[in-house]
């Protein structure tokens, strides 16, 4: 199955499950959603953007996405590079006077494998009833630059936080973050570097690059190419990409999910990180599940995340 088909398939399953709250409540409209987004873009120097057509996803899911949701594809600047990004949001949250919570989603994969294709932000916006923003890190999708797998590309996440803070419809004190797989590593590094994130969720997150390199033969080439060498040659670079080595520097409340059967990022990484967070007296929750594979969540997990983000 192609990645795009998989993405749409996951969207269909979650949306059709009826787990989500309708956006059809009456509201006092501050400004048309599209006008507000586009005004915010241009006001922040973003001129390369386009509204996305959600009709195909609406037909797939049977949910009124076109009427109730707004989605945009755009490019923003990070270290002089044009970075591809997406915004998805309930129309209601964009049009109300009060700024809303926001969720920055950090995707998994490397280079073009796992690149965002547009449906993800709408998926999370619907699933968690929030404004969702996500980017294809440098060297991924249509973004400029080179993927460094947790190196300078973390700046792309930080600069997305900068952008979200400037959006009038986003509450800068309630910018949350969700990272899956490699996106978990990106999330941990962003939390270490920046204390503006309100709450964070990591699913099947890469927390120890030393362990990942040793335990997955298929990742050795990825690390050598994108990081620049082996753990023996570049221990500082691998430590930078290993939250287990600096858990005491993470101050954002964390919710961590990992399945015992994960064959891409062994659960031992999450267990070690949880132990380090506990020893450092950090606020966190670690939830492990015997069922499911890499990046998978149960309905109960989804509800747990929704409640966690509301706190």
Where are the language model's segments positioned?
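N-terminal cap/lid segment of alpha/beta-hydrolase-fold proteins
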Residues: 51-96
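Alpha/beta-hydrolase active-site loop
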Residues: 148-168
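Alpha/beta-hydrolase fold nucleophile elbow
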Residues: 170-181
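C-terminal catalytic histidine-bearing segment of alpha/beta-hydrolase fold enzymes
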Residues: 271, 278-311
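Short substrate-entry loop that stabilizes the transition state in hydrolases
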Residues: 94-100, 105-145, 210
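Short glycine-enriched nucleophile-adjacent loop
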Residues: 184-195
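Mobile cap/lid helix-loop segments that gate and shape the active-site cleft of serine hydrolases
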Residues: 115, 210-246, 252
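Short beta-strand/loop motif that positions the catalytic acidic residue
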Residues: 250, 256-258, 262
């Amino acid at each position: 199955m192609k990645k795009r088909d998989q993405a749409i398939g996951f969207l269909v399953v979650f949306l059709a499950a009826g787990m989500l709250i309708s956006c059809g409540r009456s509201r006092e409209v501050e400004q048309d959603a599209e006008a507000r987004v586009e005004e915010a873009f241009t006001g922040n120097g973003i001129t390369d953007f386009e509204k996305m057509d959600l009709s195909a996803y609406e037909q797939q899911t049977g949910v009124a996405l076109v009427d109730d949701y707004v989605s945009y594809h755009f490019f923003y600047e990070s270290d002089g590079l044009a970075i591809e990004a997406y915004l998805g949001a309930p129309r209601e949250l964009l049009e109300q006077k009060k700024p809303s919570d926001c969720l920055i989603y950090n995707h998994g994969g490397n280079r073009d494998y796992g690149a965002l294709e547009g449906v993800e932000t709408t998926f999370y916006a619907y699933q968690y009833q929030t404004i969702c923003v996500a980017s294809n890190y440098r060297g991924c999708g249509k973004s400029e630059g080179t993927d460094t797998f947790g190196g300078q590309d973390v700046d792309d996440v930080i600069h997305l936080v900068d952008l979200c803070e400037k959006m009038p419809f986003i509450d800068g004190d309630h910018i949350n973050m969700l990272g899956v797989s490699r996106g978990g590593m990106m999330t941990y590094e962003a939390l270490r570097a920046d204390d503006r994130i309100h709450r964070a969720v990591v699913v099947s997150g890469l927390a120890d690059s030393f362990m990942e390199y040793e335990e997955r033969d298929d990742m050795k080439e990825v690390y050598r190419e994108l990081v620049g060498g082996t753990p023996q040659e570049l221990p500082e670079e691998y430590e930078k990409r290993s939250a287990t080595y600096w858990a005491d520097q993470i101050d954002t409340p964390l919710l961590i999910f990992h399945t015992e059967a994960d064959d891409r990022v062994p659960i031992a990484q999450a267990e070690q990180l949880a132990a380090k967070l506990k020893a450092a007296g950090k606020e966190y929750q670690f939830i492990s599940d015997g069922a499911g594979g890499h990046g998978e969540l149960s309905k109960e997990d989804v509800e747990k995340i929704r409640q966690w983000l509301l706190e």
